[in-house]
Curated annotation (Swiss-Prot):
Compartments, as annotated in UniProt: Secreted
Signal peptide: 1-20
Gene: Apcs
Subunit composition and interactions: Homopentamer. Pentraxin (or pentaxin) have a discoid arrangement of 5 non-covalently bound subunits.
Chain segments annotated as coiled-coil in the UniProt record: none
Name of the protein in its database record: Serum amyloid P-component
Cofactor binding note from Swiss-Prot or TrEMBL: Binds 2 calcium ions per subunit.
GO biological process, one term: host-mediated suppression of symbiont invasion
Family, per entry: Belongs to the pentraxin family.
Carbohydrate-modified residues: 52
């Protein structure tokens, strides 16, 4: 009986470290190396397909190559929703395997706050970088983003929950992830940029369900 209780305690402790719901305010996920394994799996509050969304987060990286920032895959479609940084000042959004790319001014080796919105009825895509809107584009008008998803940080999924490549991995710090099933107003996006998010209902950095896989650590955020 004592051995059984000890085993249950160890198993519970390991499970709680790997899969957690945590308030990560003023903290970051650190992805300290290139790899084809290190990632964080997110478990969203999402049971139905998406007609609209807003997704915001902060990154701090010295990578100059392309990298995956947010990978949302469903069975049969690896790039159902993907935010991909092509290079400094250039981002792509994939919806249902199709993509659009936006470009703007961005300072290298500085923290970045990124918000992306998409509205199905119009197809309009907006990128806000450090509180400033970039040129609007259109993508997949009247499309519906499928669910349930596999959501991964740190890697780009080439199949549902896997298919990672070192050359697409994110290296750096990741923080303040929030997601809504509607398009935020410009004023609300500025609130998010200033660290005052407005009731996120899909992903909430201050009550995040996540599972760490590989070499990813949590540290205080020491930059703004």
């Amino acid at each position: 009986m004592d051995k059984l209780l000890l085993w249950m305690f160890v198993f519970t402790s390991l499970l709680s470290e790997a899969f957690c719901q945590t308030d990560l305010k003023r903290k970051v996920f650190v992805f300290p190396r290139e790899s084809e394994t290190d990632h964080v799996k997110l478990i969203p509050h999402l049971e139905k397909p998406l007609q609209n969304f807003t997704l915001c987060f902060r990154t701090y990286s010295d990578l100059s190559r392309s990298q995956s920032l947010f990978s949302y895959s469903v069975k049969g479609r690896d790039n159902e929703l993907l935010i991909y940084k092509e290079k400094v000042g250039e981002y792509s959004l994939y919806i249902g395997q199709s993509k659009v790319t936006v470009r703007g001014m961005e300072e290298y080796l500085s923290p970045v706050h990124l918000c992306t919105t998409w509205e199905s009825s119009s197809g309009i895509v907006e990128f806000w970088v450090n509180g400033k809107p970039w040129v609007k584009k259109s993508l997949q008008r009247e499309y519906t983003v499928k669910a349930p998803p596999s959501i991964v940080l740190g890697q780009e999924q080439d199949n549902y929950g896997g298919g990672f490549q070192r050359s697409q991995s994110f290296v750096g710090e990741f923080s303040d992830l929030y997601m809504w099933d509607y398009v935020l107003t410009p004023q609300d996006i500025l609130f998010v940029y200033r660290d005052s998010p407005v009731n996120p209902n899909i992903l909430n950095w201050q009550a995040l369900n996540y599972e760490i896989n590989g070499y990813v650590v949590i540290r205080p955020r020491v930059w703004d």
